């Protein structure tokens, strides 16, 4: 199961990287937005948020603050005016939340309300629980995705590299 999830992670990282190369943020990465194609490759679905923002060079922080699913939102999505603007690294946080859920079967902050998640993620700086026995390189890169300063998170190209090994 770990190898399959790593393969899906690489597929998804490639998809996100392709969108980033086109100047598009995803901002709502979560397992229910992932699909499997006829060749058992994971692909991204649901482009509602990127479509909404397509063509806007600097999205309004008030709009961004309301976009995303709380269990997968990076700190700057909750408070863009305080924590910095959204960036490609914002997608790194959502990607890592999604992959941890795929490895463990447990949604990050499951059972918590949006207000509780805000308290845990933004104010207490809590990070999701990691399952045991992840490959070291994958665990290291995912851990880096949860840095609170988005500038310290890995880029999707770094994530892809870790998942391709």
What do these predicted ranges mean?
Residues 37-70:
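Activation segment/activation loop of eukaryotic-type protein kinase catalytic domains
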């Amino acid at each position: 199961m770990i190898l399959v999830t790593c393969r899906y992670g690489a597929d998804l990282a490639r998809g996100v990287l392709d969108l980033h190369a086109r100047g598009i943020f995803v901002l709502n990465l979560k397992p229910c937005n992932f699909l499997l194609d006829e060749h058992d490759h994971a692909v991204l679905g649901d482009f509602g948020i990127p479509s909404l923002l397509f063509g806007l060079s600097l999205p309004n922080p008030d709009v961004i603050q309301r976009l995303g699913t709380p269990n997968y939102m990076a700190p700057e999505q909750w408070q863009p005016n305080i924590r910095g603007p959204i960036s490609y690294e914002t997608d790194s946080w959502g990607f890592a939340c999604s992959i941890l859920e795929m490895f463990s079967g447990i949604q990050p902050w499951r059972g918590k309300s949006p207000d509780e998640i805000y308290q845990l993620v933004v104010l207490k700086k809590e990070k999701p629980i990691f399952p045991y026995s992840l490959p070291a390189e994958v665990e290291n890169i995912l851990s880096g995705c949860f840095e609170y300063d988005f500038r310290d998170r890995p880029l999707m190209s770094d994530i892809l590299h870790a998942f391709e090994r």
